[in-house]
Regions:
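Bacterial N-terminal signal peptides that target proteins for export
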Residues: 1-9
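N-terminal signal peptide c-region/cleavage motif recognized by signal peptidases
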Residues: 15-17
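Short N-terminal edge-element motif at the start of the domain
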Residues: 23-98
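Non-cytosolic coordination micro-motifs
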Residues: 44, 50, 80-219
Length: 219
């Protein structure tokens, strides 16, 4: 039996891997992938680079995508945003999302969805230096989009995000006191959402998570 050249074998294996790997982020980060089983999802997204419990991290077209598996099926999808990695949220919630092809901001999503985001944060006061905390806008969709939820996130590293968080924090400290803010009571109280909404309006989102029963920071 004639042996195949090593270069040919390598080409066949590379071709098989290419077929298994998604060609675009759009093939992985879309509403049709929610609810699919893990085996099918990985046939499109490829093999995860890292796994932590139910969370599996993939690299597609240079973009970081995290899929959370619940009982073997995809329950949430998270995309880290960069100038090269942009989310088309219309593939999840239709016209409730801003049109693709433009930077995603909290204000753009508020306008497209008709509002109703609740605002949360990992920490706003006494956070320390062990990590960079994020601020979040959480949206719960109507029946028309099967109650889909969207979680917008902005890490507090860019000046705009830091300044917006400062405005939000300072107003709450002025009204409720610093202990109230340090205890993150704002995560369970919607009184200051209008302040956060105005402050974060033009802040660009750094990651977006879509699914149902999303986890948000508590108090």
């Amino acid at each position: 039996m004639q042996k195949l050249p090593q270069t040919l074998i390598g080409s066949v294996l590379l071709g098989a891997c290419s077929l298994a790997q998604a060609s675009t982020v759009a093939e992985v980060f879309n509403g049709e992938m929610l609810g699919t089983n893990q085996r099918y999802f990985e046939s499109i997204a490829g093999i995860p680079r890292e796994s932590f419990g139910d969370e599996h991290k993939f690299r597609v077209q240079g973009c970081n995508i995290t899929a959370t598996m619940t009982e073997g099926s995809v329950s949430t999808l998270r995309l880290e945003l960069t100038p090269q990695c942009q989310a088309d949220l219309t593939q999840f919630v239709g016209d409730y999302a801003p049109p693709p092809g433009q930077p995603l901001t909290f204000g753009a999503f508020e306008q497209a969805s008709g509002g109703g985001l609740s605002y949360h944060a990992d920490c706003l006061s006494g956070c320390g230096n062990s990590y960079d905390p994020s601020v979040y806008g959480h949206w719960e969709g109507p029946r028309a989009v099967d109650f889909m939820e969207v979680l917008l996130e902005a890490v507090q590293v860019e000046d705009a995000a830091i300044e917006a968080a400062d405005i939000w924090r300072n107003q709450m400290i002025k009204t409720m006191g610093e202990d109230w803010v340090m205890d993150r009571q704002f995560n369970c109280n919607r009184q200051f959402d209008p302040v956060a909404r105005q402050a974060l309006n033009a802040v660009q989102v750094t990651a977006v998570t879509v699914g149902q029963q999303l986890r948000v920071p508590g108090c």
